[in-house]
């Protein structure tokens, strides 16, 4: 199969992303924030993607490639790990059974088959097992397929300092275009000694991709001509029979390329009895950021040669699809460019990618179904899904009429870009557009036949709604305002079908104005905010965020940060907001990624002064640091935990006094006065036990601890159970802790520096926190974590994406878990319903 699919269209919030797919390999074009999850929703297999080609150095083009490369690397790692585990099991079996306890092995064999020879077992050699499994066992990562990146000039600047959080060696597989040599050159961004040869064009067994680099005032754009390898001629039995040839050895000779002479002397070759080879059916992806780039493309020498070849022999150089990407519609909607489009031929599909005409957002059916079920259990905790007017409208509302008019007058086929739409090019009998399970807006899905069928399938399931209990309780609580918490992502490692990676949004009010804090910002966090709140509320949230704190360097906690900063930057510019010297956001990150964040802001943020980046240790109450920083300089990816250093005194009174004294320091008092003005709470970091420079956080309001209006929210980040976080999170109103693993996987949790569900609950209970909420679950729990009676007995809340509550609602919020778990179990256990989610 050979196909072209649009993963994301070019809207005001996303750049175009698409993929060319063959049976055994794929080629990705652009990879923005959220592309990984959208690709996952569409069933794209990451491991097949050989290369990524970028149209631009804009952040929306490439921000998602870190997470994509790490996920893809993890899949490679899993392959290697499986080999290693297989080897370990073989060695373990042989060494334990034959070396340590040969009698036990003999007894086991006797039980299985008493008639077998009971002669003593001989020791087995381990070495032949290694030889049999092959060299990959010795170095299982050596031959794994890597993914190569190709971008415009200066593209490598975007990846400076990424080695401190991205374990994939990007430097070895990153090529940027060199205008002076007209070739892609591998960039030595981490000072490697060996350089691969420059690449004029990309070619492999499936495809040839020709780059076209355009420059105007140092704004570079890359366009790509993608030419698949032409299929060979195929032998046609009927044509051979028409010449009077009989089936048998003659057919075999012809298929080998030999000739056959007929009785009348006519010579028959393979060409005479074969179907014509299928045309190459090229795909062109053209990016035109300005009118000047458009003019340069039309007169470009490479493009002119290609079009001439296509006109000279359209059968061989056939063009199937041309994608036209432009930020403004008038760049491509003009007489000059439309004439250029007509040169490609009348059977070409022209896809217009422009924010002024495209739909704003894409929704996955499975994700909407889960939210629908959660909403049925509690509309208070999982409010009604917001239908934003913008999601089904484009700025240019009469685009269909415009497209029809252009098509009619110029005999060309023009269509809008729809995410999830795939154009099947080979085989010819399946040629055409297909789209499955994806909807241009929430309203499209909830009015669809698919949703009506889903409702019918679950109509016999009794769904208990807990809202009456919560509403009755809320009438009797303190009317003073308490913070509102929303979980934007609740899984670990990488985005999955029903959950995104970690992010928590905390809303507080100051003088009746809503202000926001973000704890962690995994890939796709911006997309999650839009899905939860709609476009208009999202704008208000972004303009009122006052603190973003990142717990540690791992991608599932920080890869969405730059996208959030960029969207805030775009809003400030578009709304012409004038900033004073006190108008800025605190961006608090560990030192391991501070240079990367500062470099990203310097490269692509215009309102730079609005973002003040601080090292997490600035707000670390505990003067004792658990990591040997002098060792980290030479080994940035290793853990060096100084276990000899003691945790602080666990006496709550002493800790409270210590925190207060820390905040009163002259150099810190400035910060804390500003915190109260900006978001009405005090903020501190706490070093925890995960990778180097890992932190938990806590925020609290500035009232007496025994006051009914006092509140405190603690967040563990990723961590093993440790006294440091235990002590500083004491007496939290809301204690948020990671629960990556089930209690049966204590060994895995210890090895990977995480906590189990049971460990997290014990910490929260023992340090006298009022309410416990768990998050950061393993991807194996993609829909729901299996319910345990303990959760109900201890009032433990486990978060799903978009869980939202005021602190005073926590006394009953845990009650949603059991009915939701019952719904999922009812669906999973019923074979007729098993595949409806």
Per-region residue spans from a language model:
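Conserved strand-turn element in the central/C-terminal portion of the radical SAM core barrel
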Residues: 770-783
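An anion/phosphate-binding loop that grips the pyrophosphate of nucleotide cofactors and donors
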Residues: 732
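Charged helix-capping and loop-helix junction motifs
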Residues: 301-303, 750-759
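A short acidic, helix-capping loop that chelates divalent metal ions and anchors anionic groups
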Residues: 743-748
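P-loop NTP-binding site
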Residues: 315, 321, 766-767, 777
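Binuclear metal-dependent hydrolase catalytic cores
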Residues: 1-314, 320, 326-715, 720-727, ...
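Histidine/lysine/aspartate-rich catalytic loop segments that bind and position anionic ligands
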Residues: 737-742
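A structural motif corresponding to the C-terminal end of an alpha-helix
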Residues: 762-772
């Amino acid at each position: 199969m050979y196909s072209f699919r649009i993963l994301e269209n070019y809207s005001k919030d996303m750049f175009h992303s698409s993929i060319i797919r063959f049976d055994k390999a794929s080629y990705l074009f652009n990879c923005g924030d959220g592309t990984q999850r959208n690709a996952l929703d569409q069933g794209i297999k990451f491991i097949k993607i050989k290369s990524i080609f970028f149209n631009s150095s804009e952040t929306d083009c490439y921000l998602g490639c870190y997470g994509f490369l790490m996920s893809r690397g993890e899949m490679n790692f899993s392959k290697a790990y499986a080999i290693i585990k297989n080897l370990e099991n073989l060695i373990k079996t042989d060494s334990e059974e034959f070396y340590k306890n040969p009698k036990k092995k003999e007894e086991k064999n006797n039980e299985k088959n008493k008639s077998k020879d009971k002669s003593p077992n001989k020791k087995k050699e381990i070495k032949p097992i290694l030889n049999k499994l092959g060299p990959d066992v010795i170095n299982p990562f050596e031959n794994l397929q890597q993914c190569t990146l190709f971008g415009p000039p200066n593209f490598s600047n975007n990846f400076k300092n990424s080695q401190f959080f991205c374990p994939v060696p990007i430097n070895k597989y990153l090529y940027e275009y060199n205008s002076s040599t007209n070739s892609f050159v591998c960039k030595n961004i981490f000072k490697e000694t060996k350089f691969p040869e420059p690449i004029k064009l990309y070619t492999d067994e499936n495809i040839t991709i020709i780059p076209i680099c355009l420059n105007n005032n140092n704004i570079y754009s890359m366009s790509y001509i993608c030419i698949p390898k032409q299929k060979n001629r195929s032998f046609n039995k009927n044509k051979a029979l028409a010449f009077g040839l009989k089936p048998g050895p003659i057919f075999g000779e012809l298929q080998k390329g030999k000739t056959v002479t007929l009785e009348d002397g006519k010579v028959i070759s393979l060409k005479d009895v074969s179907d014509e080879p299928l045309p190459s059916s090229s795909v062109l992806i053209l990016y035109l950021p300005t009118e000047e780039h458009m003019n340069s493309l039309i007169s470009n020498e490479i493009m002119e040669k290609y079009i001439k070849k296509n006109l000279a022999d359209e059968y061989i150089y056939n063009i199937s699809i041309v994608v036209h990407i432009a930020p403004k519609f008038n760049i491509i909607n003009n007489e000059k460019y439309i004439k250029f489009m007509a040169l490609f031929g009348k059977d070409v599909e022209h896809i217009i990618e422009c924010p002024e005409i495209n739909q704003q957002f894409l929704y996955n059916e499975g994700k909407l179904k889960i939210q629908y079920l959660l909403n049925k259990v509690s509309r208070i905790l999982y409010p009604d899904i917001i239908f934003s007017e913008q999601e089904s409208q484009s700025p240019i509302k009469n685009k269909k009429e415009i497209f029809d008019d252009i098509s009619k007058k110029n005999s060309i086929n023009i269509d809008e870009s729809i995410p999830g739409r795939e154009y099947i090019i080979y085989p010819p009998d399946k040629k055409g557009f297909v789209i499955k399970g994806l909807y241009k807006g929430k309203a499209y899905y909830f009015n669809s036949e698919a949703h009506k069928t889903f409702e019918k399938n679950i109509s016999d399931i009794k769904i208990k709604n807990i809202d009456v209990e919560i509403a009755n309780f809320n009438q009797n609580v303190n009317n003073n305002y308490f913070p509102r918490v929303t979980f934007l992502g609740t899984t670990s490692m990488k985005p999955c079908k029903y959950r995104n990676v970690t992010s928590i949004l905390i809303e507080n009010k100051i003088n009746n104005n809503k202000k926001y804090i973000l704890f962690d910002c995994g890939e796709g966090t911006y997309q999650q905010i839009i899905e939860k709140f709609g476009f208009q509320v999202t704008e208000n949230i972004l303009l009122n965020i006052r603190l973003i704190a990142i717990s540690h360097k791992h991608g599932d906690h920080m890869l969405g940060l730059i996208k959030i900063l960029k969207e805030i930057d775009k809003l400030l510019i578009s709304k012409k907001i004038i900033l004073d010297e006190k108008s800025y956001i605190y961006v608090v990150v560990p030192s391991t990624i501070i240079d990367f964040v500062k470099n990203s802001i310097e490269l692509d943020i215009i309102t730079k002064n609005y973002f003040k980046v601080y090292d997490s240790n600035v707000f670390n109450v505990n003067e004792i640091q658990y990591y040997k920083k002098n060792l980290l300089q030479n080994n940035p990816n290793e853990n060096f935990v100084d276990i000899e250093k003691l945790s602080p005194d666990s006496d709550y009174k002493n800790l409270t006094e210590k925190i207060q004294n820390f905040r009163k320091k002259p150099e810190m008092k400035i910060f804390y006065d500003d915190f109260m003005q900006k978001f009405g709470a005090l903020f501190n970091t706490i070093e925890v036990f995960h990778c180097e420079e890992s932190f938990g956080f806590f925020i609290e309001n500035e009232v007496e601890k025994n006051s009914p209006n006092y509140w405190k929210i603690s967040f563990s980040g990723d961590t093993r159970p440790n006294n440091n976080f235990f002590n500083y999170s004491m007496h939290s109103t809301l204690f948020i802790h990671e629960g990556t693993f089930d209690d049966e996987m204590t060994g895995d949790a210890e090895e990977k520096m995480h906590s189990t569900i049971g460990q997290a609950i014990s910490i929260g209970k023992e340090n006298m926190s009022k309410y416990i909420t768990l998050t950061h679950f393993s991807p194996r729990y993609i829909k729901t974590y299996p319910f345990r009676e303990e959760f109900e007995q201890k009032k433990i809340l486990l978060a799903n994406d978009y869980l939202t509550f005021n602190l005073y609602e926590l006394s009953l919020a845990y009650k949603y878990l059991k009915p939701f778990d019952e719904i999922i179990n009812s669906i999973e256990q019923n074979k007729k319903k098993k595949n409806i989610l």
